[in-house]
Amino acid sequence: MKFLWYLLILSIGAAGGWYARQAYVAPTAPKAAPTREALAQKAAAGNAEAAYQLGEMYLTTQGGAAAPETAAAYFRLAAFKDFMPAQNELARFYEEGLAGVPKNATEGLFWRMLAARGGSAEAQQMVQEAFSQNPAVYAQAFQIFTAYQQARIGSGTGALAFAGQLEKGGALNEDEEEAVKWLAVAAERNIPAAQARLGLKYAQGVGVAQDENKAFSLLASAAQAGEPLAQLYWGRRAYTQSAAEGGPDYAEAFKWFMNAADKGNTEAQYLTGVMYMQGQGTEKSVSKALQAFSRAAEGGHASAQYVVGQSYYKGLGIRRNISEARKWLTKAAANGNQAAKDLLEEIK
Protein backbone atom coordinates (compact mmCIF):
# COMPACT_ATOMS: atom_id res chain seq x y z
CA MET A 1 0.00 0.00 0.00
CA LYS A 2 2.82 2.36 0.89
CA PHE A 3 4.39 1.53 -2.42
CA LEU A 4 1.24 2.56 -4.25
CA TRP A 5 1.14 5.89 -2.42
CA TYR A 6 4.79 6.38 -3.20
CA LEU A 7 4.17 5.81 -6.89
CA LEU A 8 1.25 8.22 -6.77
CA ILE A 9 3.36 10.88 -5.07
CA LEU A 10 6.10 10.37 -7.65
CA SER A 11 3.66 10.67 -10.49
CA ILE A 12 2.16 13.85 -9.02
CA GLY A 13 5.60 15.23 -8.42
CA ALA A 14 6.66 14.44 -11.94
CA ALA A 15 3.55 16.02 -13.34
CA GLY A 16 3.95 19.01 -11.10
CA GLY A 17 7.51 19.36 -12.22
CA TRP A 18 6.42 19.19 -15.87
CA TYR A 19 3.82 21.88 -15.38
CA ALA A 20 6.29 23.91 -13.38
CA ARG A 21 8.86 23.70 -16.14
CA GLN A 22 6.24 24.69 -18.73
CA ALA A 23 5.24 27.68 -16.65
CA TYR A 24 8.66 29.20 -17.16
CA VAL A 25 8.36 29.17 -20.98
CA ALA A 26 7.65 32.72 -22.07
CA PRO A 27 4.27 32.90 -23.83
CA THR A 28 4.24 33.85 -27.48
CA ALA A 29 3.21 37.48 -27.86
CA PRO A 30 0.06 37.95 -29.97
CA LYS A 31 0.77 39.24 -33.45
CA ALA A 32 0.13 42.93 -33.86
CA ALA A 33 -2.52 43.84 -36.40
CA PRO A 34 -0.90 44.95 -39.67
CA THR A 35 -0.81 48.67 -40.23
CA ARG A 36 -2.33 50.37 -43.22
CA GLU A 37 1.15 51.28 -44.40
CA ALA A 38 2.36 47.67 -44.28
CA LEU A 39 -0.71 46.42 -46.10
CA ALA A 40 -0.40 49.17 -48.71
CA GLN A 41 3.14 48.01 -49.50
CA LYS A 42 1.95 44.43 -49.93
CA ALA A 43 -1.00 45.52 -52.04
CA ALA A 44 1.28 47.58 -54.27
CA ALA A 45 3.42 44.46 -54.74
CA GLY A 46 0.38 42.55 -56.00
CA ASN A 47 -0.94 40.89 -52.84
CA ALA A 48 -4.70 40.65 -53.37
CA GLU A 49 -5.53 39.63 -49.80
CA ALA A 50 -3.60 42.61 -48.44
CA ALA A 51 -5.52 44.92 -50.77
CA TYR A 52 -8.79 43.44 -49.53
CA GLN A 53 -7.77 43.76 -45.87
CA LEU A 54 -6.77 47.36 -46.49
CA GLY A 55 -10.15 48.01 -48.06
CA GLU A 56 -11.83 46.60 -44.96
CA MET A 57 -9.72 48.87 -42.76
CA TYR A 58 -10.62 51.96 -44.78
CA LEU A 59 -14.31 51.14 -44.36
CA THR A 60 -13.81 51.64 -40.61
CA THR A 61 -11.56 53.74 -38.40
CA GLN A 62 -9.19 50.83 -37.87
CA GLY A 63 -5.69 52.20 -38.27
CA GLY A 64 -6.86 55.70 -39.14
CA ALA A 65 -9.76 57.70 -40.49
CA ALA A 66 -12.46 55.96 -42.50
CA ALA A 67 -12.25 56.57 -46.25
CA PRO A 68 -14.93 54.57 -48.10
CA GLU A 69 -13.83 55.70 -51.57
CA THR A 70 -10.29 54.51 -50.86
CA ALA A 71 -11.76 51.24 -49.60
CA ALA A 72 -13.59 50.80 -52.91
CA ALA A 73 -10.36 51.39 -54.84
CA TYR A 74 -8.56 48.67 -52.86
CA PHE A 75 -11.47 46.25 -53.26
CA ARG A 76 -11.28 46.88 -57.01
CA LEU A 77 -7.56 46.18 -57.00
CA ALA A 78 -8.11 42.88 -55.18
CA ALA A 79 -11.12 41.99 -57.33
CA PHE A 80 -9.12 42.28 -60.54
CA LYS A 81 -6.66 39.83 -58.97
CA ASP A 82 -9.47 37.28 -58.60
CA PHE A 83 -9.90 37.64 -54.82
CA MET A 84 -13.48 36.43 -54.41
CA PRO A 85 -14.43 38.29 -51.19
CA ALA A 86 -13.35 41.55 -52.84
CA GLN A 87 -15.41 40.75 -55.95
CA ASN A 88 -18.52 40.27 -53.83
CA GLU A 89 -17.85 43.40 -51.79
CA LEU A 90 -17.23 45.50 -54.90
CA ALA A 91 -20.38 44.10 -56.50
CA ARG A 92 -22.36 45.28 -53.47
CA PHE A 93 -20.92 48.77 -53.86
CA TYR A 94 -22.08 48.95 -57.48
CA GLU A 95 -25.46 47.40 -56.73
CA GLU A 96 -26.21 49.90 -53.97
CA GLY A 97 -24.13 52.90 -55.07
CA LEU A 98 -21.99 52.91 -51.92
CA ALA A 99 -18.79 54.77 -51.03
CA GLY A 100 -19.01 57.26 -53.87
CA VAL A 101 -19.24 54.46 -56.44
CA PRO A 102 -21.90 55.25 -59.08
CA LYS A 103 -24.75 52.75 -59.02
CA ASN A 104 -24.31 50.36 -61.94
CA ALA A 105 -26.34 47.15 -62.09
CA THR A 106 -24.35 45.80 -65.03
CA GLU A 107 -21.00 46.22 -63.32
CA GLY A 108 -22.37 44.81 -60.08
CA LEU A 109 -23.54 41.69 -61.89
CA PHE A 110 -20.23 41.42 -63.76
CA TRP A 111 -18.38 41.16 -60.44
CA ARG A 112 -20.96 38.69 -59.12
CA MET A 113 -20.32 36.51 -62.17
CA LEU A 114 -16.61 36.50 -61.42
CA ALA A 115 -17.26 35.65 -57.78
CA ALA A 116 -19.71 32.92 -58.82
CA ARG A 117 -17.07 31.43 -61.09
CA GLY A 118 -14.80 31.35 -58.05
CA GLY A 119 -17.32 29.32 -56.08
CA SER A 120 -19.28 31.92 -54.10
CA ALA A 121 -22.72 30.48 -53.33
CA GLU A 122 -24.07 33.97 -52.63
CA ALA A 123 -22.90 35.23 -56.02
CA GLN A 124 -24.20 32.14 -57.83
CA GLN A 125 -27.64 32.74 -56.35
CA MET A 126 -27.65 36.41 -57.39
CA VAL A 127 -26.52 35.59 -60.93
CA GLN A 128 -29.29 33.02 -61.20
CA GLU A 129 -31.85 35.58 -60.02
CA ALA A 130 -30.59 38.17 -62.52
CA PHE A 131 -30.92 35.65 -65.35
CA SER A 132 -34.63 35.22 -64.65
CA GLN A 133 -35.55 38.67 -63.33
CA ASN A 134 -33.40 41.08 -65.35
CA PRO A 135 -32.40 39.42 -68.64
CA ALA A 136 -31.22 42.63 -70.34
CA VAL A 137 -28.70 43.41 -67.60
CA TYR A 138 -27.71 39.74 -67.46
CA ALA A 139 -27.04 39.66 -71.22
CA GLN A 140 -24.86 42.76 -71.09
CA ALA A 141 -22.94 41.63 -68.02
CA PHE A 142 -22.40 38.18 -69.53
CA GLN A 143 -21.04 39.72 -72.73
CA ILE A 144 -18.52 41.72 -70.69
CA PHE A 145 -17.71 38.68 -68.54
CA THR A 146 -17.02 36.64 -71.70
CA ALA A 147 -14.75 39.33 -73.16
CA TYR A 148 -12.86 39.54 -69.86
CA GLN A 149 -12.38 35.78 -69.72
CA GLN A 150 -11.03 35.81 -73.27
CA ALA A 151 -8.76 38.76 -72.47
CA ARG A 152 -7.31 36.94 -69.46
CA ILE A 153 -6.09 34.09 -71.65
CA GLY A 154 -4.47 36.47 -74.12
CA SER A 155 -7.18 37.06 -76.73
CA GLY A 156 -6.54 40.34 -78.51
CA THR A 157 -10.15 40.76 -79.58
CA GLY A 158 -11.34 39.96 -76.07
CA ALA A 159 -8.91 42.47 -74.57
CA LEU A 160 -10.01 45.15 -77.05
CA ALA A 161 -13.68 44.52 -76.30
CA PHE A 162 -13.15 44.59 -72.53
CA ALA A 163 -11.07 47.78 -72.75
CA GLY A 164 -13.93 49.43 -74.61
CA GLN A 165 -16.27 48.71 -71.71
CA LEU A 166 -13.87 50.51 -69.36
CA GLU A 167 -13.52 53.61 -71.53
CA LYS A 168 -15.89 56.57 -71.64
CA GLY A 169 -19.23 55.43 -72.96
CA GLY A 170 -18.70 51.79 -71.96
CA ALA A 171 -21.10 49.80 -69.80
CA LEU A 172 -18.64 49.67 -66.88
CA ASN A 173 -17.68 52.70 -64.86
CA GLU A 174 -14.82 54.55 -66.51
CA ASP A 175 -11.36 53.25 -65.58
CA GLU A 176 -8.78 54.52 -68.06
CA GLU A 177 -5.79 52.94 -66.32
CA GLU A 178 -7.35 49.49 -66.51
CA ALA A 179 -8.41 50.17 -70.10
CA VAL A 180 -4.80 50.96 -71.02
CA LYS A 181 -3.69 47.64 -69.56
CA TRP A 182 -6.05 45.67 -71.80
CA LEU A 183 -5.46 47.84 -74.88
CA ALA A 184 -1.78 46.98 -74.49
CA VAL A 185 -2.64 43.27 -74.57
CA ALA A 186 -4.60 43.77 -77.79
CA ALA A 187 -1.94 46.05 -79.32
CA GLU A 188 0.70 43.38 -78.71
CA ARG A 189 -1.47 41.08 -80.83
CA ASN A 190 -1.13 43.63 -83.67
CA ILE A 191 -4.76 44.71 -83.66
CA PRO A 192 -4.75 48.13 -85.42
CA ALA A 193 -7.78 49.50 -83.54
CA ALA A 194 -6.05 48.77 -80.22
CA GLN A 195 -2.79 50.31 -81.42
CA ALA A 196 -4.63 53.47 -82.44
CA ARG A 197 -6.56 53.84 -79.20
CA LEU A 198 -3.52 53.07 -77.07
CA GLY A 199 -1.43 55.47 -79.14
CA LEU A 200 -3.94 58.26 -78.54
CA LYS A 201 -3.83 57.61 -74.81
CA TYR A 202 -0.05 57.90 -74.83
CA ALA A 203 -0.32 61.08 -76.91
CA GLN A 204 -2.83 62.65 -74.52
CA GLY A 205 -1.57 61.15 -71.26
CA VAL A 206 -4.93 59.52 -70.52
CA GLY A 207 -4.71 56.55 -68.14
CA VAL A 208 -0.95 56.43 -68.67
CA ALA A 209 2.04 58.79 -68.58
CA GLN A 210 2.32 60.86 -71.74
CA ASP A 211 4.90 59.42 -74.13
CA GLU A 212 5.10 60.86 -77.64
CA ASN A 213 7.55 58.23 -78.88
CA LYS A 214 5.23 55.37 -77.95
CA ALA A 215 2.26 57.30 -79.31
CA PHE A 216 3.91 57.92 -82.69
CA SER A 217 5.07 54.32 -83.01
CA LEU A 218 1.63 52.88 -82.26
CA LEU A 219 -0.26 55.39 -84.38
CA ALA A 220 2.10 54.95 -87.32
CA SER A 221 1.61 51.18 -87.26
CA ALA A 222 -2.15 51.55 -87.00
CA ALA A 223 -2.37 54.13 -89.79
CA GLN A 224 -0.30 52.02 -92.17
CA ALA A 225 -2.61 49.10 -91.39
CA GLY A 226 -5.57 51.24 -92.46
CA GLU A 227 -7.04 52.09 -89.05
CA PRO A 228 -9.17 55.25 -89.59
CA LEU A 229 -8.75 56.58 -86.05
CA ALA A 230 -4.97 56.66 -86.54
CA GLN A 231 -5.31 58.14 -90.03
CA LEU A 232 -7.50 60.88 -88.57
CA TYR A 233 -4.77 61.59 -86.00
CA TRP A 234 -2.08 62.02 -88.66
CA GLY A 235 -4.39 64.20 -90.71
CA ARG A 236 -5.02 66.51 -87.77
CA ARG A 237 -1.34 66.59 -86.95
CA ALA A 238 -0.45 67.65 -90.50
CA TYR A 239 -3.28 70.21 -90.53
CA THR A 240 -2.19 71.88 -87.29
CA GLN A 241 1.61 71.76 -87.61
CA SER A 242 3.25 74.76 -85.99
CA ALA A 243 5.57 77.16 -87.80
CA ALA A 244 8.50 75.51 -86.02
CA GLU A 245 7.45 72.21 -87.61
CA GLY A 246 7.20 73.79 -91.05
CA GLY A 247 3.60 74.97 -90.83
CA PRO A 248 0.42 73.15 -91.87
CA ASP A 249 0.75 70.54 -94.60
CA TYR A 250 -2.72 70.64 -96.12
CA ALA A 251 -1.99 68.13 -98.88
CA GLU A 252 -0.79 65.58 -96.32
CA ALA A 253 -3.75 66.33 -94.07
CA PHE A 254 -6.24 65.92 -96.91
CA LYS A 255 -4.68 62.59 -97.87
CA TRP A 256 -5.08 61.17 -94.38
CA PHE A 257 -8.59 62.59 -93.94
CA MET A 258 -9.70 61.06 -97.23
CA ASN A 259 -8.29 57.67 -96.23
CA ALA A 260 -10.19 57.74 -92.94
CA ALA A 261 -13.33 59.17 -94.57
CA ASP A 262 -13.44 56.36 -97.10
CA LYS A 263 -13.55 53.91 -94.17
CA GLY A 264 -16.58 55.63 -92.69
CA ASN A 265 -15.02 57.88 -90.03
CA THR A 266 -17.54 60.72 -89.70
CA GLU A 267 -15.08 63.23 -88.23
CA ALA A 268 -12.75 62.67 -91.19
CA GLN A 269 -15.69 63.05 -93.58
CA TYR A 270 -16.59 66.35 -91.95
CA LEU A 271 -13.00 67.64 -92.10
CA THR A 272 -12.74 66.58 -95.74
CA GLY A 273 -15.79 68.74 -96.37
CA VAL A 274 -14.12 71.67 -94.61
CA MET A 275 -11.03 71.32 -96.79
CA TYR A 276 -13.07 71.10 -100.00
CA MET A 277 -15.01 74.18 -98.94
CA GLN A 278 -11.82 76.16 -98.34
CA GLY A 279 -9.69 74.63 -101.07
CA GLN A 280 -7.03 73.45 -98.64
CA GLY A 281 -4.80 70.69 -99.97
CA THR A 282 -7.28 70.06 -102.78
CA GLU A 283 -9.50 71.88 -105.27
CA LYS A 284 -12.15 74.20 -103.93
CA SER A 285 -15.52 72.55 -104.55
CA VAL A 286 -18.76 73.40 -102.79
CA SER A 287 -20.53 70.40 -104.31
CA LYS A 288 -17.85 67.95 -103.11
CA ALA A 289 -17.84 69.66 -99.72
CA LEU A 290 -21.60 69.17 -99.39
CA GLN A 291 -21.25 65.53 -100.42
CA ALA A 292 -18.69 65.01 -97.66
CA PHE A 293 -20.80 66.91 -95.10
CA SER A 294 -23.86 64.86 -96.08
CA ARG A 295 -22.00 61.56 -95.54
CA ALA A 296 -20.89 62.72 -92.11
CA ALA A 297 -24.39 63.99 -91.29
CA GLU A 298 -25.93 60.64 -92.22
CA GLY A 299 -23.45 59.04 -89.82
CA GLY A 300 -24.67 61.23 -86.94
CA HIS A 301 -21.96 63.95 -86.90
CA ALA A 302 -23.60 66.95 -85.21
CA SER A 303 -21.49 69.69 -86.83
CA ALA A 304 -22.02 68.17 -90.27
CA GLN A 305 -25.76 67.97 -89.63
CA TYR A 306 -25.74 71.66 -88.76
CA VAL A 307 -23.82 72.57 -91.93
CA VAL A 308 -26.22 70.57 -94.10
CA GLY A 309 -29.23 72.11 -92.36
CA GLN A 310 -27.81 75.61 -92.71
CA SER A 311 -27.04 74.98 -96.38
CA TYR A 312 -30.65 73.95 -97.04
CA TYR A 313 -31.94 76.94 -95.08
CA LYS A 314 -29.80 79.50 -96.88
CA GLY A 315 -29.54 77.74 -100.23
CA LEU A 316 -25.75 77.51 -100.06
CA GLY A 317 -24.64 75.30 -102.94
CA ILE A 318 -27.99 73.55 -102.88
CA ARG A 319 -31.62 74.45 -103.57
CA ARG A 320 -33.29 76.07 -100.58
CA ASN A 321 -35.54 73.64 -98.71
CA ILE A 322 -36.94 74.66 -95.31
CA SER A 323 -38.29 71.19 -94.59
CA GLU A 324 -34.87 69.58 -95.13
CA ALA A 325 -33.22 72.39 -93.20
CA ARG A 326 -35.49 71.81 -90.22
CA LYS A 327 -34.90 68.04 -90.37
CA TRP A 328 -31.10 68.31 -90.25
CA LEU A 329 -31.02 71.15 -87.75
CA THR A 330 -33.31 69.17 -85.45
CA LYS A 331 -30.94 66.20 -85.64
CA ALA A 332 -27.95 68.45 -84.91
CA ALA A 333 -29.74 70.11 -82.00
CA ALA A 334 -30.62 66.71 -80.55
CA ASN A 335 -26.91 65.88 -80.71
CA GLY A 336 -26.08 68.98 -78.68
CA ASN A 337 -25.15 71.51 -81.40
CA GLN A 338 -26.01 74.94 -79.98
CA ALA A 339 -25.76 76.76 -83.32
CA ALA A 340 -28.42 74.42 -84.70
CA LYS A 341 -30.69 75.16 -81.74
CA ASP A 342 -30.30 78.89 -82.35
CA LEU A 343 -31.02 78.59 -86.08
CA LEU A 344 -34.10 76.48 -85.40
CA GLU A 345 -35.44 79.30 -83.25
CA GLU A 346 -34.89 81.68 -86.17
CA ILE A 347 -36.73 79.37 -88.57
CA LYS A 348 -39.71 79.11 -86.26
Task: State the predicted function of each range.
Residues 28-37, 65-74, 101-111, 135-146, ...:
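Structural signature of tandem alpha-helical TPR/SEL1-like repeats
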